[in-house]
């Protein structure tokens, strides 16, 4: 008998993230054992994740578990997990919008969904939130199309476009677009009171003014991640808000058991800044607001898909901190969010507190398929 388990595996780049895609029936049914297997697949806990497939970056330490739909209106079930790099934690408390963009193509290629040319619409049941997502995937020769002329900032080259619709994800974690009922709350912190907006669309997100955390909002990843005091303060705010909206009982529990969600971002009005990935200047005229999003206690080098849907929705709710810094876009439904590596546009329509549209364009590509091996002795 082999001393290693062999598990079918696919690695996909989805949006500006990269993840491991597994079928649910290829994993142990017991949750505790399943999480041990997942940690070994990724090589966690280890700062380098050297003994697993992950890449020692929060944006590549992501998992999608796919299975037949348990929802009457959906085509496929999808469970997302953020796998901690340094701790033995598999966080199922929210969804990843970028990884979601890989689910439709995976479902088509693995025959969970019948391929229809030239475009297949896949209804995805996200089990983390109980919400439905919709992916419009271009199809060619019975498989998800890869080549195309769609460029998304943060990914080299171009690929086939995919529309991801998060319009049905309002109140994903808390049941309400505004979990506290307020557009702005005043939070007591170790550095004094600070205004926060907590909005729950696709995933719950916390928004603060960049100036209130002594930042401009246009800083590069190195500057932000090198500021230990800032990182600690943002995590304090995030943990307090996590407790406030009922996602954790204590701040300690929020940091240890729900490190990924809710996310927190600091925002500012449109202005010029430098794309850290290319060195090019992004004009303030090309964005409607600028945001820096924290994820797993470090800066997200681009912008999370779910946070994009949430930020766009927050921008359309009068009085929120995001709305306060939003450029006047007139009748235009698209909100252009400036992030460290470019701009991400999102179609955002909110009327009378109801999210009518939250959609963005992503691309995805299957990189590898094969088997991942897990040492059985390490599962004890």
From Swiss-Prot:
It is an enzyme of class 5 (isomerase). The keyword Isomerase applies. Optimum pH is 6.8-8.2. It holds the Pfam family PrpF. Inhibited by oxidized glutathione, p-chloromercuriphenylsulfonic acid and iodoacetic acid. Not inhibited by the chelating agent alpha,alpha-dipyridyl. Activity is slightly increased by EDTA. Not activated by Fe(2+), Mg(2+), Mn(2+) or Ca(2+). Unaffected by K(+), Na(+), NH4(+), Rb(+) or Li(+). InterPro entries: PrpF-like (IPR007400). It catalyses: 2-methylene-3-methylsuccinate = dimethylmaleate. Homotetramer. Belongs to the PrpF family. Catalyzes the reversible isomerization of (R)-3-methylitaconate to 2,3-dimethylmaleate. Has very low isomerase activity with itaconate. This is 3-methylitaconate isomerase.
């Amino acid at each position: 008998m082999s001393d290693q388990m062999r598990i079918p595996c696919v690695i996909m780049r989805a949006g500006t993230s990269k993840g491991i895609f597994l079928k649910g029936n290829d994993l142990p049914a017991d949750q505790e054992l399943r999480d041990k297997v997942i940690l070994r697949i990724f090589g966690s806990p280890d700062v380098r994740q050297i003994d697993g497939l992950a890449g020692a970056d929060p944006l590549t330490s992501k998992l999608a578990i796919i299975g037949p739909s348990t929802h009457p209106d959906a085509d496929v079930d999808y469970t997302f997990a953020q796998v901690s790099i340094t701790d033995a934690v598999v966080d199922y408390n929210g969804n990843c919008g970028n990884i979601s963009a890989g689910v439709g193509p995976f479902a088509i290629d693995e025959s969970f969904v019948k391929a229809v040319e030239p475009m297949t619409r896949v209804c995805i049941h996200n089990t983390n939130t109980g919400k439905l997502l919709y992916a419009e995937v271009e199809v060619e020769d019975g498989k998800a199309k890869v080549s195309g002329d769609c460029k998304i900032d943060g990914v080299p080259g171009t690929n086939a476009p995919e529309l991801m619709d998060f319009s049905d994800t309002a109140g994903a974690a808390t049941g309400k677009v505004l979990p506290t009922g307020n557009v702005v709350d005043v939070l007591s912190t170790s550095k004094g009171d600070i205004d926060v907006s907590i909005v729950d669309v696709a995933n719950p997100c916390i928004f603060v003014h960049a100036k209130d955390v002594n930042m401009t909002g246009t800083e590069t990843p190195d500057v932000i991640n090198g500021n230990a005091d800032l990182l600690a303060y943002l995590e304090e705010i995030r943990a307090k808000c996590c407790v406030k909206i009922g996602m954790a009982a204590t701040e300690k529990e929020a940091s240890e058991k729900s490190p990924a969600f809710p996310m927190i971002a600091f925002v500012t009005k449109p202005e010029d800044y430098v794309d850290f990935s290319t060195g090019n200047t992004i004009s303030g005229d090309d964005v409607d607001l600028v945001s820096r999003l924290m994820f797993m206690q470090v800066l997200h080098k681009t912008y999370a898909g779910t946070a994009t849907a949430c930020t766009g929705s927050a921008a359309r709710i009068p009085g929120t901190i995001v709305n306060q810094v939003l450029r006047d876009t007139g009748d235009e439904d698209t909100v252009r969010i400036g992030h460290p590596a470019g701009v991400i546009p999102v179609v955002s329509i909110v009327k009378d507190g109801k999210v009518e549209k939250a959609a963005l364009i992503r691309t995805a590509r299957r990189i590898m398929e094969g088997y991942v091996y897990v040492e059985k002795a390490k599962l004890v």
